[in-house]
Amino acid sequence: MIKVAVNGYGTIGKRVADAVAAQPDMEIIGVSKTKPGAEAFVALERGYPLYIADISKKEAFEKAGIPVAGSVEEMIAKADIVVDATPGGVGVSNKELYAKYQKKAIWQGGEDHEVAGFSFNSSCNYAEALGRDTARVV
């Protein structure tokens, strides 16, 4: 099983997580949120372990009735690959964290080409994407 972490469980991330969960050879090892809101409850309903970007906010999540599995860094350490669905401009700051744990990464959403050095579109460069450690999806 390929262990997938979804960093950023919002508009894009929740769709990515559901698509990954539907694959027979992949499993969601965790999703992340920055605030204890409705999407965090959706993640729990779907059985996705919830990790948080700022572990100092753990009490706020638990006070809202949302159990926290750990920090984003702990989630990344457990994953084989990370799908970054954080808001535009945030994902680039995560690049060093993924490299620290030698994780493959896919950026979804608003990051620039430079974040991965490769922008993927299935209709034009599928073959070139094979074997890459990082990619940005456009």
Where do the language-model regions lie?
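N-terminal Rossmann-like NAD(P) cofactor-binding subdomain of oxidoreductases
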Residues: 1-138
